[in-house]
């Protein structure tokens, strides 16, 4: 059993265009402000990492995230992970040049898994995060979705995670579509199932879980689950 030192909390900023947004189940997205101002606020409050996700880049092939990351990286001096619409080496390189420390990939790599290996070879596995948007579609079965929870992939999240790890990802971001934005607590069944997979396969990889936190007491439900390193809120 791996000994848990502490759970890290990192702010998750979901972006649409030039705005920070929030929604429920990754739907019904509403604007709540400027990503730059919120990033600076979280940094001033002691955040030691930021997760920034462009929620429409994969749908519309938008790449305005570069300028947003560039501005944030000049004001916020902690590691920044960026996801959304990363289709190739060029997109990834532009994010790194504009201040990203890690990138989170999802839609493009479900269609072209070899891209994971190409990114890991070019930038290092430690900088590649596999973003898995999980939705329950049967008893003890979760499917990986893409395009902010809109599109089926037909991929079992366990099989997909194992393939991603084999191809070279250095970290996993596991988001519960069913619980995201609901503030009703974490999807414990999903997280425990994923933790069991890591344990059974003897896989040691940083795991970020996201979706559902509504109060600090919700963290108590996670503390005794192995392999969780970080909570994105």
PLM feature segments, named:
Residues 30-43, 87-94, 152-163, 219:
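Short, acidic/polar
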Residues 9-13, 22, 50-52, 80-84, ...:
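Hydrophobic faces of well-ordered beta-strands that scaffold small-molecule active sites
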Residues 4, 15-17, 21-22, 26, ...:
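Conserved anion-binding
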Residues 19-63:
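N-terminal beta-alpha supersecondary unit
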Residues 73-76, 80-103, 189-231:
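Catalytic cores of alpha/beta
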Residues 63-70, 113, 154-158, 184-193:
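Charged helix-capping and loop-helix junction motifs
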Residues 49-68, 107, 173-185:
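Glycine-rich, proline-tolerant flexible connector loops at the mouths of alpha/beta enzymes
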Residues 14, 42, 50, 82, ...:
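Conserved, mostly hydrophobic/aromatic
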């Amino acid at each position: 059993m791996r000994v848990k030192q502490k759970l890290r909390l990192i702010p998750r900023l979901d972006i649409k265009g030039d705005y920070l947004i929030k929604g429920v189940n990754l739907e019904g997205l509403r604007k709540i402000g400027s990503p730059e101002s919120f990033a600076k606020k979280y940094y001033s409050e002691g955040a030691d990492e930021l997760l920034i996700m462009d929620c429409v880049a994969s749908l519309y092939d938008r790449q305005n995230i570069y300028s947003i990351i560039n501005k944030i990286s000049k004001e916020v001096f902690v590691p920044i992970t960026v996801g959304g619409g990363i289709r190739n080496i060029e997109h990834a390189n532009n994010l790194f040049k504009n201040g990203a420390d890690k990138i989170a990939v999802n839609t493009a790599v479900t269609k072209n898994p070899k891209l994971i290996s190409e990114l890991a070879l070019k930038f290092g596995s430690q900088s590649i995060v596999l973003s898995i948007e999980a939705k329950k579609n049967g008893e003890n079965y979760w499917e990986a979705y893409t395009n902010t929870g809109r599109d089926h992939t037909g991929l079992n999240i366990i099989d997909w995670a194992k393939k991603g790890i084999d191809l070279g990802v250095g970290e996993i971001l596991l988001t519960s579509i069913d619980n995201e934005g609901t503030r009703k607590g974490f999807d414990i069944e999903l997280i425990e199932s994923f933790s069991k997979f890591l344990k059974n396969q003897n896989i040691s990889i940083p795991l970020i879980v996201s979706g559902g936190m509504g109060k600090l007491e919700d963290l108590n439900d996670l503390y005794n689950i192995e392999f969780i390193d970080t909570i994105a809120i």
